[in-house]
């Protein structure tokens, strides 16, 4: 049961960070969303909000990075799958929930959030760069193309949330597909 409560709190924190950002999410919000009893906060996270934030972002980042690292898709397919995931998520949440890593990295996020987010982005970048080099793209171009894809998709997520439309993300996905196709041809 304790593990279930802890996991529910982490999952709720990630969802709330995606929706509100790290700074605008309180312990009370996480408790309400997870249904966890008030006394469970410091039982599961004795380091307080810093620990909750750090672990939640590390968990979210680890999930995304692991999907990239385990992928047997080529680089173009990896990028397309990443964009399509957020298209579905934006539609599912009525544009309320974006990327938890971005939420942690921006808006004055503290080191307990920004550090794990930076690590996850680095893992994603590394996995995509590796896929590109295995497909014959030389460095430093492979690294640049990975940066372009991650930056473009993250920016398109912001635009899509702002406009309440997946069009920016779809346009970005299509342009990245063309760029990657020309490089990988």
Roles of regions detected by a PLM:
Residues 66-97, 146-149:
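Hydrophobic alpha-helical connector segments
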Residues 106-107, 150-167, 180-185:
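Amphipathic C-terminal alpha-helical segment
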Residues 57-63:
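Short, basic, alpha-helical segments at the C-terminal edge of helix-turn-helix-like DNA-binding modules
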Residues 8, 81, 85, 100-103, ...:
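Amphipathic alpha-helical interaction segments
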Residues 69, 80-81, 110-135, 144-147, ...:
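Amphipathic alpha-helical packing segments from all-alpha helical-bundle domains
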Residues 1-3:
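N-terminal intrinsically disordered/low-complexity leader segments
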Residues 53, 81, 92-112:
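Amphipathic alpha-helical segments used for helix-helix packing
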Residues 8, 12-55:
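Helix-turn-helix
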């Amino acid at each position: 049961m304790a593990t279930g409560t802890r996991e529910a709190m982490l999952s709720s924190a990630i969802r709330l960070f995606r929706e509100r950002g790290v700074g605008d999410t309180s312990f009370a919000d996480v408790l309400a969303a997870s249904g966890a009893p008030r006394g469970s906060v410091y039982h599961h996270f004795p380091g307080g909000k810093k620990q909750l934030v750090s672990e939640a972002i590390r968990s979210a980042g680890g999930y995304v990075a692991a999907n990239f690292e385990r992928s047997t898709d080529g680089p173009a397919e990896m990028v397309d799958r990443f964009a399509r995931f957020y298209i579905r998520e934006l539609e599912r949440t009525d544009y309320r929930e974006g990327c938890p890593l971005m939420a942690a990295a921006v808006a004055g996020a503290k080191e307990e959030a920004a550090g794990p987010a930076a690590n996850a982005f680095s893992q994603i970048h590394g996995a995509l760069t590796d896929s590109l080099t295995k497909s014959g793209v030389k460095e430093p171009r492979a690294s640049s193309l990975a940066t372009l894809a991650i930056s473009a998709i993250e920016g398109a997520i912001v635009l899509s949330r702002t406009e309440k439309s997946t069009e920016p993300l779809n346009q970005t996905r299509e342009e990245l597909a063309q760029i990657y196709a020309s490089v990988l041809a």
